[in-house]
């Protein structure tokens, strides 16, 4: 079955909470781009437009005791974990109520058992260390780390996989493979495959090509349970799509690549599957994000309190 067929078949099974979260992340990211365009935000940002379904699919497979490690494209990772758009926006804008007092910004967030970083590959060895701690002190909990295809160019990835395999650590590695590392197509910077590289260390690999939440969870539930029960690390590779440029700048991809990404956008596929229900949910989350932007923008600047 084609990707489009699978999405149309199963999209009606996406419950209201899942659909609301998908659309919340989409409109949050669009709002950030609008704020940057109007000069109301400083620094840079990397949206997860097109990839929102990955953390949403995983959220019901993760437990409160698990540690989650996001990356530079991590707004969706955070929102799927906490559903706290106001706190995250305040952090990015440097406003009162910011998650980290306004000093972390878009990429560097720490809250409870969640952390994100903009340093490529850095989170994987840290996650391996946390997984070792969990294995010793909290059996059944795992460390889940999100990385991209470009991160496989970092040596720390292989050091972490080596030790994780040797020590059979409860480490879940989520690879969001959108086919391009910043502005370099993956086919031009990676020899071999993610699967082959993981399996070279004796680490299990599972590929996901669908954006259907129910199908993804059905596939991954027993595999994630195996990570928790001592089966060792697992690499799950999502073949996904990045709708926009790497950051806020020009998109260097050819028009055909961008068209393919938009054709496979979960947003379009889910909208076609259940138009009326989707439209209601879409408008509700658009209005929610608009209200949050107005409210957070009116707050005073945040203050860092060590």
Where would I find each of the regions flagged by the language model?
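Generic structural hydrophobic/aromatic packing signal, biased to beta-strands
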Residues: 22, 68-70, 89, 236, ...
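A generic structural signal for short, non-catalytic loop/turn and secondary-structure boundary residues
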Residues: 15-18, 63, 119, 229
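Conserved acidic/glycine
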Residues: 1-55, 60-61, 246-306
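Cofactor-binding active-site loop characterized by glycine-rich and histidine/acidic residues
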Residues: 27-33, 38-167, 185-195, 200-202
């Amino acid at each position: 079955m084609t990707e489009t067929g699978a999405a149309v078949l199963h999209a009606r099974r996406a419950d209201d909470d899942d659909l609301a979260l998908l659309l919340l992340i989409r409109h949050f990211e669009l709002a950030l781009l609008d704020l940057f365009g109007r000069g109301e935000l400083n620094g840079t940002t990397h949206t997860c437009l097109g990839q929102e379904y990955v953390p949403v699919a995983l959220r019901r497979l993760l437990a409160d005791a698990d540690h989650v490690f996001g990356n530079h494209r991590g707004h969706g990772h955070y929102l799927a974990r906490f559903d706290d758009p106001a706190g995250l926006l305040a952090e990015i804008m440097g406003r009162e109520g910011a998650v980290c007092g306004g000093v972390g910004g878009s990429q560097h967030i720490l809250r409870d058992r969640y952390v994100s970083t903009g340093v490529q590959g850095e989170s994987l060895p840290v996650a391996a260390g946390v997984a070792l701690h969990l294995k010793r002190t909290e059996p059944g909990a795992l460390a889940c780390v999100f990385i991209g295809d470009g991160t496989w160019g970092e040596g720390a990835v292989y050091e972490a996989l080596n030790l994780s395999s040797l020590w059979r650590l409860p480490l879940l590695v989520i690879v969001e493979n959108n086919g391009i590392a910043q502005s370099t197509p993956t086919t031009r910077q990676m020899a071999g495959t993610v699967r082959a590289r993981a399996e070279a260390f004796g680490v299990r690999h599972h590929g996901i090509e669908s954006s259907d939440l129910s199908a993804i969870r059905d596939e991954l539930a027993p595999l994630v349970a195996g990570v928790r029960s001592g089966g060792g690390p697992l690499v799950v590779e999502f073949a996904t799509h990045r709708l926009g440029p790497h950051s806020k700048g020009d998109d260097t991809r050819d028009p055909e690549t961008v068209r393919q990404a938009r054709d496979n956008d979960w947003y379009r596929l889910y909208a076609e599957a259940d138009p009326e229900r989707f439209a209601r949910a879409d408008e509700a989350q658009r209005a929610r994000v608009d209200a949050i932007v107005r409210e957070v923008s009116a707050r005073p600047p945040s203050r860092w309190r060590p």
